[in-house]
Swiss-Prot record:
GO CC aspect terms: plasma membrane
Organism superkingdom: Bacteria
Localization of this protein: Cell membrane
Membrane topology, record value: Peripheral membrane protein
EC number: 7.1.1.-
Described function: NDH-1 shuttles electrons from NADH, via FMN and iron-sulfur (Fe-S) centers, to quinones in the respiratory chain. The immediate electron acceptor for the enzyme in this species is believed to be a menaquinone. Couples the redox reaction to proton translocation (for every two electrons transferred, four hydrogen ions are translocated across the cytoplasmic membrane), and thus conserves the redox energy in a proton gradient.
Protein name in UniProt: NADH-quinone oxidoreductase subunit C
Species, as recorded: Mycolicibacterium vanbaalenii (strain DSM 7251 / JCM 13017 / BCRC 16820 / KCTC 9966 / NRRL B-24157 / PYR-1)
NCBIfam families: NuoC_fam, PRK07785.1
Keyword Membrane among record annotations: yes
Ranges for region Disordered: 1-20
GO molecular function, a single term: NADH dehydrogenase (ubiquinone) activity
Amino acid sequence: MTGDDEPDPEVIGVRRGMFGAKGSGDTSGYGRLIRSVALPGSSPRPYGGYFDDVVDALESALGHDVFAESVERVVVYRDELTLEVHRDRLVDVAQTLRDDPDLRFELCLGVSGVHYPDDADRELHAVYPLMSITHNRRIRIEVAAPDSDPHIPSLFRVYPTTDWHERETYDFFGLIFDGHPALTRIEMPDDWVGHPQRKDYPLGGIPVEYHGAEIPPPDERRAYS
């Protein structure tokens, strides 16, 4: 996402070309394209629809001061409400979203890892889509951690269905979910080095002979950012 159409976007980097590739020629026709890489900024009130009701109910349940310390930013982007939450407050916020009768987000639908190498001190993100069956509502909570300290509290005791989702996010992105009952790799071998869905993970591969020419593996001829 570029975020250029959002209020006060947070610019975290610059992308050159169609795909941000480096190390070889660009065949897309967009080699000179330069775009800012930005995350959506905080959204102003009113958020629209039921989003205001959700934010107001959460602030009322937590208390104004705790809400201000817990929720770093409220973002409405492409008709989705995301609450960016401080990682130390993640469990308390999630439990309130689940248990408060005015909120009742009973289901956590998964965990998505995201790697933003240019988001200084917030390179690793985890996103949790939540659903309220009681009120027929959907929101997301998002939490960030730095590469140097990739620890996030596990939501297993609040939403047990996050069990394998957190394991997969750990496996592919290296986020460590503190308090998880069995945080081990779930798809890659136990002795695998690195986390394959991070943007700094080498593409890998082997040399290939094609029409008499030897083509080097992808990680030697091109890198993406």
